[in-house]
């Protein structure tokens, strides 16, 4: 029996040849099985093996798509592990540290990119590029308080706060979402994206903006340049900021480089910290994330992995039976990715997670306090640095209070298993058994530097309106 098994355990010459281009030295057996599974598929297609070898041996040269059939859920299983095929083979042959499909974008020459939802999917690793973090332009803070107090957004923000419902509204992903750039995974074919309910609109968001709104942003265009060219600085006839559709009103007066102090964004050592709560009690120490890929799960991890925050390790003498039962259902929890200046949350738990992110709500045109339900196996973009940068650059021209208000965008709340809001009997996140609060250090530190540069508020921050 052993001799029979050994006859079939050898590595074929084609697999050995392809493994010669493998990157990294980890998970040899897994990579071998992944390549072996691919070879079996490609041998059925004339010229596919040759095209793949050509792409791997000559990275700088043009190559054709190398495709395999798309599975029902879009994923491929290799040795008890499921993953997206283009991610698997980009990891084998280009980037061994690749974590997620959010880190990849197809090149224009690719005819069968993963995101196109065709019957075939291209796995040519040189038909994809890795997403790079965008360079955020510095915010130009006036050296003197030259903005008109009448232009302050404080009144608008106070009115918005007063109009916030006692209970947050709710939205379910993807049913309540209409932005196609945040697709659920896996996505069923021809999935409809109904418009979000008008009653849950975030005032002046990309999805709902009034004329002349300082927060009027195009939803899917890159941020405008904030630094005027040197030859235009100080001229009286300075032009509005260049945008793709001229939707953003001119909010920067004519200024010279001597009148403003640029405040640049700096990437911190830890991109976020995560604090765990049970009801209204904080449990354990804060977790500081240095890895761009973080798992928050309900298990224990004796190895003390720096990319895992294991809630199963944390004890609480005040824990009741509801909390105990909820903790048992957290399971694999949530996977947080920080990629290309964007934060994604992927629900790995069998139960849904519930997210309150003002940045995400702003993008989708929801009310600021809306709680979004993310079902199992779905992922959602919950923060976008570039949109935040636009808001910050514009808020500077409307006073200290408008900038200070953006601190609320830098904190994201997320509950496991149990939701809260208008559609649930729990009205507040502190009524849910198990939840976390995520603090985004980069945006918070940027805000702090801008506020320091701006000096004192025109109207002192107060709990009394």
From Swiss-Prot:
Residues 198-214 have a biased composition (Low complexity). Residues 271-465 form the MH2 domain. GO terms for cellular component: cytoplasm; cytosol; heteromeric SMAD protein complex; mitochondrion; nucleoplasm; nucleus; protein-containing complex. Phosphorylated on serine by BMP (bone morphogenetic proteins) type 1 receptor kinase. Residues 169-182, 234-243 have a biased composition (Polar residues). Its main location: cytoplasm. Keywords: Acetylation, Cytoplasm, DNA-binding, Metal-binding, Mitochondrion, Nucleus, Phosphoprotein, Transcription, Transcription regulation, Zinc. Residues 13-137 form the MH1 domain. The modification N-acetylthreonine is found at residue 2. Transcriptional regulator that plays a role in various cellular processes including embryonic development, cell differentiation, angiogenesis and tissue homeostasis. Upon BMP ligand binding to their receptors at the cell surface, is phosphorylated by activated type I BMP receptors (BMPRIs) and associates with SMAD4 to form a heteromeric complex which translocates into the nucleus acting as transcription factor. In turn, the hetero-trimeric complex recognizes cis-regulatory elements containing Smad Binding Elements (SBEs) to modulate the outcome of the signaling network. Homodimer. Forms trimers with the co-SMAD SMAD4. Interacts with PEBP2-alpha subunit and SMURF1. Interacts with SUV39H1 and SUV39H2. Interacts (via MH2 domain) with LEMD3. Interacts with WWP1. Interacts with TMEM119. Interacts with ZNF8. Interacts with RANBP3L. Interacts with HK1. Interacts with HGS; this interaction attenuates BMP signaling. This is Mothers against decapentaplegic homolog 5.
